[in-house]
Design a protein with these regions (language model features):
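Short alpha-helical transmembrane segments in multi-pass integral membrane proteins
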Residues: 1-12, 70-137, 168-171, 177-239, ...
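Transmembrane helical elements of multi-pass membrane transporters/channels
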Residues: 10-29, 131, 142, 165, ...
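Helix-terminus/linker motif at the lipid-water interface of multi-pass membrane proteins
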Residues: 24-43, 112-119, 175-182, 239, ...
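Alpha-helical transmembrane segments of multipass membrane proteins
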Residues: 27-31, 144-148, 170-175, 203, ...
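Small-residue-rich hydrophobic transmembrane alpha-helices
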Residues: 42-102, 139-158, 266-324, 328, ...
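Small-residue-enriched core segments of transmembrane alpha-helices in multipass membrane transport
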Residues: 162-169, 272-273, 385-394
Length: 430
């Protein structure tokens, strides 16, 4: 195996492991809610999680922007600047978190307007939100810290933080619900406790590995006007990009919901296949962020180009595996996700769309990692804006016959456009 392949796997595999823990945690929390004796608890758990996804989704730049800038500083051997990036990211995370806490009432109102749950679920979801929202400082700070570790070529520390929050969440929720008899609110309390325990663990890792550099750092220097403006410019592009991604996702769900419960269920299952593919591809993208950023910072163009080629080799291998699985075993996969024979049968009829997902999106995932590493965030924004425009035109203004196939045509085109535009931008500049 080539040295660059070992480097890619060294960073990618811990990231994939960390990603896998996310749905497992959701399943365990859902299982705890399911044992409380009322279906409304399950609904409230789902709605509460969705509310925070809507709130936090747009702040993914705290991880991505931090990762790229840190990797470049690492490549230059500039430890002082790498620490300064961390301080800027954590300062911005704290400011955003305080704003979320102060604006929690209008935020929960807006999120519930978008989701529109039943009155019983709404009341429980509100109670869940008003407890877990106090974890915003911990959640956003950990986004920045995990991005920083990734930029420092240390995805294992980022993985440990993710596993820590998941394990503590499960233990704390079980204790709060079944030992302390807190009921549904025990799940929210367990989540809140886990977030701050994981934040403490994150700080412990930072000082254990980089304590000397952190103690010598100057917050005033890190936050000086010119330095902060460059940091904010990178993150502003990613913020707008994330907002566009959220709009497409919400539109996809909304349009699918109008076609009836069966279509909504089918789309949800197929979207799980996209999410499953993304768990693997995110690992390769994270490796791209770290390694491309490192070689960009070191101004090593030859090694950078070699890294990009190998990222696409690994991405293509993952794509082929998923295409074979989705094309050859759709009934088996869908049967694992639901026992409803009608839903499985309907979902299998969309086999070609399932296969198209990895083909259309593979390059987009890889390019995202490359562009973040190079901090070419304006190019990422251009790709997503163009792709989003294509999605909305096909979905709402095309002569293509209405129905679920038009929706999937729009979504696959959106993924393919992201891949195509970023390919063009990279080839133009190299």
């Amino acid at each position: 195996m080539k040295p660059i392949d070992r480097e890619i796997l060294r960073i990618a595999l811990p990231a994939v492991v960390a990603n896998i823990t996310v749905p497992l945690l959701g399943l365990i929390d859902m299982s705890i809610a399911g044992h409380l004796g009322d279906a409304a608890f399950i609904g409230a758990m789902s709605v509460g999680a969705t509310m925070f996804n809507l709130v936090y989704w747009n702040f993914g730049f705290l991880r991505m922007g931090t990762s790229g800038l840190t990797a470049q500083a690492y490549g230059r051997g500039d430890t002082s600047e790498a620490i300064s990036v961390l301080l800027r990211a954590c300062s911005l995370a704290t400011a955003i978190a305080l704003a979320i806490v102060m604006l929690q009432y209008p935020l929960q109102w807006l999120a519930l307007k978008v989701i529109s749950p039943s009155s019983e679920v709404l009341h429980l979801a509100q109670r869940y939100f008003f407890v877990v929202v106090w974890g915003a400082p911990a959640i956003l700070a950990m986004m920045a810290i995990k991005g920083w570790f990734l930029g420092m070529q240390d995805s294992q520390s980022a993985m440990r933080i993710s596993i820590c929050v998941d394990v503590v969440n499960v233990i704390a929720s079980l204790v709060a619900v079944f030992v302390l008899r807190m009921g549904f609110m025990g799940i929210a309390t367990g989540t809140l406790v886990a977030e701050y325990v994981a934040l403490a663990y994150s700080v412990h890792l930072l000082y254990k590995k980089h304590g000397t550099a952190l103690r010598q750092a100057s917050i005033a220097q890190a936050l000086r006007g010119g330095n902060m403006r460059g940091f904010m410019s990178v993150n502003a592009d990613i913020f707008v990009r994330s907002f566009c991604l959220m709009l497409v996702t919400l539109a996809f769900i909304s349009v699918g919901a109008r076609s009836g419960n069966l279509t909504l269920a089918v789309n949800s299952l197929i979207m799980q296949l996209f999410i499953l593919f993304s768990y693997s591809m995110d690992g390769i993208a994270f490796a791209g962020e770290a390694l491309v950023g490192r070689y960009e910072g070191a101004n090593d163009r030859e090694q950078l180009r070699c890294t990009v080629k190998r990222l696409f080799v690994w991405g293509s291998a993952v794509m082929v595996v998923y295409c074979i699985a989705y094309g050859g075993l759709p009934e088996v996969i869908f049967s694992l996700l639901t026992s409803d024979a009608d839903v499985v049968s309907a979902a299998v009829s969309y086999r070609l769309w399932c296969v198209a997902i990895p083909i259309a999106s593979m390059a987009a995932f890889v390019w995202d990692g490359v562009f973040i590493g190079q901090t070419r965030t304006r190019g990422m924004l251009l790709a997503v804006v163009t792709a989003s425009a294509a999605f909305f035109v096909i979905c709402f203004a095309s002569p293509y016959p209405e129905g679920n196939n038009r929706l999937w045509t729009a979504f696959i085109t959106y993924l393919a456009m992201r891949s195509a535009v970023q390919t063009w931008l990279y080839m133009r500049r190299g």
